[in-house]
């Protein structure tokens, strides 16, 4: 079975409970659409679990990108403003060389991936006017990292589709889309599927969501 999660944000306990709920095994595959750390109190526990699992695949999110840029520039301000302090504290307590290893790993992460008829991405995509004349490879190859990690404007618009592909995204908590903390669940809108249920935001009734691609079953912790 193939599963997708996003925006776990250091919520390690919920992450482990989700793996137990879906009976995740070595025969399954899990794709995490970025933002695995920051804000929550156990960010590197999740990351270390992913690093040790051949069948769990991380895509880059904007929080991974902020760490990457902070490492390169030495300017931590944007990363810290967005909750990077919880991650940095754990990095400091790791062995020498861990931060460099983490940087090299994150630097190489993909920011968009196609699984059958699903396009997996953290935030958004660029839809050119002629996109339906393109092959899937051409469409994916024209995507830019900043759009895929930050953009909220395109995915979900009724005019922005690519053939019969569904686009699965995180980044924008569903509470921000519905303007409600009630009935928090995955949103299907047009060709887009929003799976960030704001796990780290408990005051907003945040949940960790997981979508099984094989039958579209939804799971929540």
Describe every region a protein language model picked out.
Residues 2-9, 118-124, 193-195:
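Active-site-proximal beta-strand elements of phosphoester/diester hydrolases
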Residues 7, 35, 50, 61-62, ...:
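Divalent metal-coordination and catalytic microenvironments
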Residues 24-25, 52-53, 158-162, 180-188:
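Short, conserved loop/helix-junction motifs that constitute active-site signature segments
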